[in-house]
Amino acid sequence: MRYLKKVTIYISLLILVSGCGNGKETEIKQNFNKMLDMYPTKNLEDFYDKEGYRDEEFDKKDKGTWIVGSTMTIEPKGKYMESRGMFLYINRNTRTTKGYYYVRKTTDDSKGRLKDDEKRYPVKMEHNKIIPTKPIPNDKLKKEIENFKFFVQYGDFKNLKDYKDGDISYNPNVPSYSAKYQLSNNDYNVKQLRKRYDIPTNQAPKLLLKGDGDLKGSSIGSKSLEFTFIENKEENIFFSDGVQFTPSEDSES
C-alpha cells in the first residue's frame, strides 16, 4: 500500500525532476543544513535555548516549540507492518516537554480490509529523561519507552557535503523537494541505527531528505529524513525522523 502510493508520487514528479542538476542539489543541501547541524543534540533540554526559523507566522512573544520525532517501521515478508516511535513537543515558552510513544500495527478488519491500530502512551521529558505519565501495561514496554533515544541525539551529518550523485526532485508548484542518496553499511548513521534496532536485512539503505515549503526558508512546511532499507510490495523496512520549529499555539493541535 505504501509502496504503490510512493510509486504514484514519483511518477507524477518525473517531468519536474528533469533539469534539476548540481545547482538544485546544492540548494537542497543548504536548505537542510540548519536542521542537520543540530545532529547530534545529546541533551534534549538544549532545545529550550535553540532558536529556530521565525517569520510572520510567529507571535512576537512566542519563543516557539520544537517537535522531534523518530519512528522505525518494519513489515516483514508475509506479515503485517508495525511502526514504533515517539514524538515530543518541546515548548520554549514554558520550558516543559510532553509527547507520546506509539505503536501502530496494520491488520485486517472483519471484512479483510487493511486498518491501522495505534496505541499511544503519554510521556514527558525532565532532565533529559523520558518519563511515562500513565501506567504502562508491561515492564518490557516501559523500559523501551524510558530508554528511547531520538535520532537527533546520536545522528551526525557532518559529512553531508560528501554525499554525491543524489536523485533530485523539485516541484516549484507545491513547493516540494527531495534528495536521495545510496548509503553503505559503513556509513556512521547506518551503523548507529543497526546498533539500536533489530533490522532484519543486511541491505544498505537509501537516505531521503524531503521537504515542502519555500526552499529559502519558511515556518510553513516541514522537513524529514528517511532511511529506506527495503521497499517493495511484499516487504518494507524504513526509519523516519524529523525536527521542526513551529509556533507554540499550533504545535500540539
Swiss-Prot record:
Principal place of residence: membrane
Superkingdom, natural source: Bacteria
N-palmitoyl cysteine lipid attachment residues: 20
GO cellular component, one term: plasma membrane
Leader sequence segment: 1-19
Membrane topology of this protein: Lipid-anchor
Residues with lipidation of kind S-diacylglycerol cysteine: 20
Keywords from the named record: Cell membrane, Lipoprotein, Membrane, Palmitate, Signal
PROSITE patterns given in the database record: PROKAR_LIPOPROTEIN
Subcellular location: Cell membrane
InterPro entries: Csa (IPR007595), Csa_sf (IPR038641)
SS bond partners: none
Family from the record: Belongs to the staphylococcal tandem lipoprotein family.
Protein name as annotated: Uncharacterized lipoprotein SERP2443
Source organism of this protein record: Staphylococcus epidermidis (strain ATCC 35984 / DSM 28319 / BCRC 17069 / CCUG 31568 / BM 3577 / RP62A)
